[in-house]
From Swiss-Prot:
Domain PSI: 555-602
Transmembrane stretches, start-end: 1037-1057
Name listed for the protein in its UniProt record: Semaphorin-5B
Keywords: Developmental protein, Differentiation, Disulfide bond, Glycoprotein, Membrane, Neurogenesis, Repeat, Signal-anchor, Transmembrane, Transmembrane helix
Signal peptide (UniProt feature, chain positions): none
Span of domain Sema: 103-553
Function: May act as a positive axonal guidance cue.
Domain TSP type-1: residue ranges: 664-720, 722-771, 853-908, 910-965, 966-1010
Organism: Homo sapiens (Human)
Higher taxonomy: Eukaryota, Metazoa, Chordata, Craniata, Vertebrata
InterPro entries: Plexin_repeat, PSI, Semap_dom, Semap_dom_sf, Semaphorin, TSP1_rpt, TSP1_rpt_sf, WD40/YVTN_repeat-like_dom_sf
Gene3D superfamilies cross-referenced by the UniProt entry: ligand-binding face of the semaphorins, domain 2, Thrombospondin type-1 (TSP1) repeat, YVTN repeat-like/Quinoprotein amine dehydrogenase
Disulfide links within the chain: C172-C182, C199-C208, C322-C425, C346-C388, C676-C713, C680-C719, C691-C703, C734-C765, C738-C770, C749-C755, C865-C902, C869-C907, C880-C892, C922-C959, C926-C964, C937-C949
This protein's GO CC annotations: plasma membrane
């Protein structure tokens, strides 16, 4: 039906139907009047398909029933329906929006499953992050706190409070600072080997400590933080510890923040700094980063450009100093002599270049010798940002070029040639006062430090640019894709998002943003405090105001389809054609089947599906149902939250909701008769109907009548006689009395022969073995064995023993052969009754001289044993060839083969496991314990030299994994005492996300060792000396006392003579200074002359006001220029003053 008015007054039905039928469309006829009916019937067919489906609580009618609704608030409904008609009319601005190409974004909710978060009650400003991959931990410095977190999920390993003392805070506030400023903000955090060096503002009293990397609560050393950490937490600073252990810090070193310096301390070299109060060296700098590279220490900063003649502008700089610099002599004492700085150029090329002057962050990529920098426009100008990359070779080229020098304050800055164009921190070869000085002239070092040429980036255009956004932090990762190596940039913004971009020379991918990560909840905007990258774990660590986040660098598993995986253009991810999933190159099953498509920048999908807005308020309406009428409630909604955009789908679901309409119940048609309850014999059938056509609701009448009918069935179908098995008969007699026989029994099928199953059943019986019965064979006739020349002979006869169980006659076995031998004399006097055959043989042997009886040859060698173990046999044979029987001679008598037992030892046994024992009780009641069970290799045990059992002899299983009260596991046992006399124990948090009420406190504890556990090392002779104690008597004691008295007397005399000698020297030195009045402290009046003056000491000041190195007790200058005027007022004399009061005195009493 076209969208318009229908002249027919017939009402339509609310009927669900297939998409291609007219019944699918929800059409409402309004019977308030002809014009009203036509109006609504013209509007409703034009609803979106989702609004024409009868779903949910909407009233559904079928059949010829007609429905008519009266809406007092019809204008409200028509307005909602008409607004849904405007979805298809897209304004021109929306068409332009659909044509834009924007980079993809990852919403906070979509990123949360991949992110690990750490917060701590009361901790703020998580600005300092230091990675310790060897300890698998992240060191975090926050306001008043230090933390050790796990690199895997930033879970808490240790929390240590490092707050300022109450006196320090009160002193800070008395100087006009706020309570927020008068806290301890960590501003230096460096992991150096097994120590962590950290500095904090300490309520405007900077302090530094060195702590154990595995136990932050243990302080190894405390030193002054001045010139190493700023006073004010808002001042930028940076620091690096060189490979020689020297600290290079760039910060302001005074309370007011007007004395910036690049300062070296804590090493073997002398402390050095930049020139004090010299704006040409440093002009209101903001320090960004510091790196130890080769022979130099590099510092990246931004400052007011002193060489800019017109107005005030900010330039980005790179400065460097030689690590072997020892300062000057007489000129530039305690000051860098190798300090140089050059401008960093990051701009858009053109006839009038557009400069990004302010450096915000830097990242050193040592594998490529690259320095990436984040640059922005001035804070008061239009926001714009860029990322530029610089080669170290380009930086060195700028420092090897000419300098820029200003002769006087009114002169221009002009280029001047570099006296040492390839300066590499060389030193002077001469000895003496200039020993260890660099080869650079001190006069040049004092006036030539600004380079004339700027450091140019790798590419003329910035790697990445972005308007209307200010970048704040940057880290870079190297990713090996299938075809090339990519530099992936992670850029932090001041709004709290992280941009993931590509740095590549390809024009199609230049300035390509892969995605933007929203790490903060919607509506929250704050700059990132810190950004660190761990390449080995492919993870980002983000420092925020209230916590730390761990964000993975890749989320390949988030792309479910091949199109999404390849369309992301992510160098980390590719489609594995074999496994049919998105994975990294390392996780792919076959590199040849792993594909990527990084040919263009990814584009955000701006298509948006429509969504319904809120329902309008319920309005009463009436309906007509035949001769009766009732009331309903109706409401409507529009597809405008949001509207479909850029080809998105329309809203799915109904646009009109009709509910609470009163209905009288009506019966449905009777169902078909069910099957008869029996297959034979009398049964019954059932049919039903329900009061649901329609069901009564909202006050409607219920149906009148029965909902169930029954009737008899199968009255004339008798059941057949049942066929069944009779009982089993008795078991028959066993077929064998022993050795295992069989028994059977039978049953019969009653009323037929078609019973299911077998009619015969068998079972075994008499399984015990039968007794063995032996039988001997009769003796054989006597047979001659040896016949002598005289006619005497030996004869033998044989018989055999047979044995077999009666139940198995086929198992007959032959026993050992028994042999009897007798000797028969030649005269026949013996009782040798021979057989006729034997006599014939004997007579024939005596009558025929040519008859030769057989003789045995020698035995052959023994054969190999038939078995390797458990009693086998071996055999040897002989032949009747010595001689062979001839002319009717007798054959050889005896056996041609002889058997012998061999290898009676038992066979080797391979070991086998015994059964597992029962599980032991759980080792802990909470916090995670374990069961244990064991088995042994004794079933059987292996014989010596044979294979042992393979596998584990002990198994363990987890138990009692529920968390202990308050989330902590039980404390471990105290460890053994260390060399420092301390013990420690630890526990771990069982809660996945510990909150304020769970896992409070430290995860480790330490204590001094009890005296009973501290090992005491005694001399080797102590035992021997103990045996001689009984020989020490009173005589020995007296002799010892006298010896000690004499020794102390001699020592006292020596000390006294030494003091007298020193005092004489002191009197002589006093005469060097005449006793003239000290005009600075002249008291005047009538006091005695020797009481009118007080002692004073004058010293020359350090020219640069350097802070002495607290740890090495190193002072840069020898205090040679010291002048002293000394007077001794009565009643004291000159000997009452300690010699330390005067540096000129070098003799000290032995006191």
């Amino acid at each position: 039906m076209p969208c318009g008015f229908s002249p027919s007054p017939v009402a339509h039905h609310l009927v669900p139907g297939p998409p291609d039928t007219p019944a699918q469309q929800l059409r409402c006829g309004w019977t308030v009047g002809g014009w009203l009916l036509s109006l609504v019937r013209g509007l409703l067919p034009c609803l979106p398909p989702g609004a024409r489906t009868a779903e949910g609580p909407i009233m559904v009618l079928a059949g010829p029933l007609a429905v008519s609704l009266l809406l007092p608030s019809l204008t409200l409904l028509v307005s909602h329906l008409s607004s849904s008609q405007d979805v298809s009319s897209e304004p021109s601005s929306e068409q332009q929006l659909c044509a834009l190409s924007k980079h993809p974004t990852v919403a906070f909710e979509d990123l949360q499953p991949w992110v690990s978060n750490f917060t701590y009650p009361g901790a703020r400003d998580f600005s300092q992050l230091a990675l310790d991959p060897s300890g698998n931990q992240l060191i975090v410095g926050a306001r008043n706190y230090l933390f050790r977190l796990s690199l895997a999920n930033v879970s808490l390993l240790q929390a240590t409070e490092w707050a300022s003392s109450e006196d320090t805070r009160r002193s800070c506030q008395s100087k006009g600072k706020t309570e927020e400023e008068c806290q301890n903000y960590v501003r230096v955090l460096i992991v150096a080997g097994r120590k962590v060096f950290m500095c904090g503002t300490n309520a405007f009293s900077p302090m530094c400590t060195s702590r154990q990397v595995g136990n932050l609560s243990r302080t190894i050393e405390k030193i002054n933080g001045v010139a190493r950490c700023p006073y004010d937490p808002r001042h930028n600073s940076t620091a690096v510890i060189s490979s020689q252990g020297e600290l290079y810090a760039a910060t302001v070193i005074d309370f007011s923040g007007r004395d910036p310096a690049i300062y070296r301390s804590l090493g073997s070299g002398p402390p050095l700094r930049t020139a004090q109060y010299n704006s040409k060296w440093l002009n209101e700098p903001n320090f960004v980063a510091a790196y130890d590279i080769g022979l130099f220490a590099y510092f990246f900063l931004r400052e007011n450009a002193v060489e800019h003649d017109c107005g005030r502008t900010v330039y980005s700089r790179v400065a460097r100093v030689c690590k072997n610099d020892v300062g000057g002599r007489f000129l530039l004492e305690d000051t860098w002599t190798t300090f140089m700085k050059a401008r960093l150029n990051c701009s858009r090329p053109g006839e009038v270049p557009f400069y990004y002057n302010e450096l915000q962050s830097a990242f050193h990529l040592p594998e490529q010798d690259l320095i990436y920098g984040v640059f922005t426009t001035n804070v008061n100008s239009i926001a714009a940002s860029a990322v530029c990359a610089f080669n170290l070779s380009a930086i060195s080229q700028a420092f090897n070029g000419p300098f820029r020098y200003q002769e006087n304050p009114r002169a221009a800055w002009l280029p001047i040639a570099n006296p040492i164009p390839n300066f590499q921190c060389g030193t002077l070869p001469e000895t003496g006062p200039n020993e260890n000085l660099t080869e650079r002239s001190l006069q040049d070092a004092q006036r030539l430090f600004l380079m004339s040429e700027a450091v140019q980036p790798v590419t003329p255009e910035p790697c990445v640019t972005q308007d209307s956004v200010r970048f704040s932090h940057l880290v870079v990762d190297l990713v090996q894709a299938k075809d090339t190596l990519y530099h992936v940039l992670y850029i932090g913004t001041e709004s709290g998002t992280i941009l993931k971009a590509l740095s590549t020379a390809s024009r199609s991918l230049h300035g390509c943003y892969l995605e933007e990560l929203h790490v903060l909840p919607p509506g929250r905007r704050e700059p990132l405090r810190s950004l660190r990258i761990l390449h080995s774990a492919r993870a980002l660590f983000v420092g925020l105001r209230d916590g730390v986040l761990r964000v993975p660098l890749e989320r390949c598993a988030a792309y479910r389809s091949q199109g999404a995986c390849l369309g992301a253009r992510d160098p980390y991810c590719g489609w594995d054609g074999k496994q049919q999933r998105c994975s990294t190159l390392e996780d792919s099953s076959n590199m040849s089947l792993w594909t990527q498509n990084i040919t263009a920048c990814p584009v955000r999908n701006v298509t948006r599906d429509g969504g319904f807005g809120p329902w309008s308020p319920w309005q009463p309406c009436e309906h007509l149902d035949g001769d009766n009428s009732g009331s309903c409630l109706c409401r409507a909604r529009s597809c405008d939250s949001p509207r479909p955009r850029c080809g998105g789908l329309d809203c799915l679901g109904p646009a009109i909701h009709i509910a609470n309409c009163s209905r009288n119940g009506a019966w449905t048609p009777w169902s078909s008769w069910a099957l008869c309850s029996t297959s034979c014999g009398i049964g019954f059938q059932v049919r039903q109907r329900s009061c649901s056509n329609p069901a009564p609701r909202h006050g409607g009448r219920i149906c009148v009548g029965k909902s169930r009918e029954e009737r008899f069935c199968n009255e004339n179908t008798p059941c057949p006689v049942p066929i069944f098995w009779a009982s089993w008969g008795s078991w028959s007699k066993c077929s064998s009395n022993c050795g295992g026989g069989m028994q059977s029994r039978r049953r019969a099928c009653e009323n037929g022969n078609s019973c299911l199953g077998c009619g015969v059943e068998f079972k075994t019986c008499n399984p015990e073995g039968c007794p063995e019965v032996r039988r001997n064979t009769p003796w054989t006739p006597w047979l001659p064995v040896n016949v002598t020349q005289g006619g005497a002979r030996q004869e033998q006869r044989f018989r055999f023993t047979c044995r077999a169980p009666l139940a198995d006659p086929h198992g007959l076995q032959f026993g050992r052969r028994r042999t009897e031998t007798r000797t028969c004399p030649a005269d026949g006097s013996g009782s040798c009754d021979t057989d006729a055959l034997v006599e014939v043989l004997l007579r024939s042997g005596s009558t025929s001289p040519h008859t030769v009886s057989g003789g045995w040859a020698a035995w052959g060698p023994w054969s190999s044993c038939s078995r390797d173990c458990e009693l086998g046999f071996r055999v040897r044979k002989r032949t009747c060839t010595n001689p062979e029987p001839r002319n009717g001679g007798l054959p050889c008598v005896g056996d041609a083969a002889e058997y012998q037992d061999c290898n009676p030892q038992a066979c080797p046994v391979r070991g086998a496991w015994s059964c597992w024992t029962s599980w032991s009780p759980c080792s802990a009641s909470c916090g995670g314990g374990h069961y244990q069970r064991t088995r042994s290799c004794t079933s059987p045990a292996p014989s010596p030299g044979e294979d042992i059992c393979l596998g584990l002899h002990t198994e363990e299983a987890l138990c009692a994994t529920q968390a202990c009260p308050e989330g902590w596991s039980p404390w471990s046992e105290w460890s053994k005492c260390t060399d420092d006399g301390a013990q420690s124990r630890s526990r771990h948090c069982e809660e996945l996300l510990p909150g304020s009420s769970a896992c409070a406190g430290n995860s480790s504890q330490s204590r001094p060792c009890p005296y009973s556990e501290i090992p005491v090392i005694l001399p080797a002779s102590s035992m021997e000396e103990a045996t001689d104690c009984a020989g020490f008597n009173l005589i020995h004691l007296v002799a010892t006392g006298i010896s000690c008295f004499l020794g102390s007397g001699l020592l006292t005399l020596a000390v006294y003579l030494s003091c007298q000698h020193c005092q004489r020297q002191s009197q002589e030195s006093t005469l060097v200074h005449p006793a003239t009045p000290n005009h600075l402290h002249y008291k005047g009046g009538g006091t005695p002359k020797n009481e009118k003056y007080t002692p004073m000491e004058f010293k020359t000041l350090n020219k640069n006001n350097l802070i002495p190195d607290d740890r090495a007790n190193f002072y840069p200058l020898q205090q040679t220029n010291v002048y002293t005027t000394t007077y001794y007022p009565s009643p004291l004399n000159k000997h009452s003053f300690r010699p330390e009061a005067s540096p000129g005195q070098r003799c000290f009493p032995n006191s």
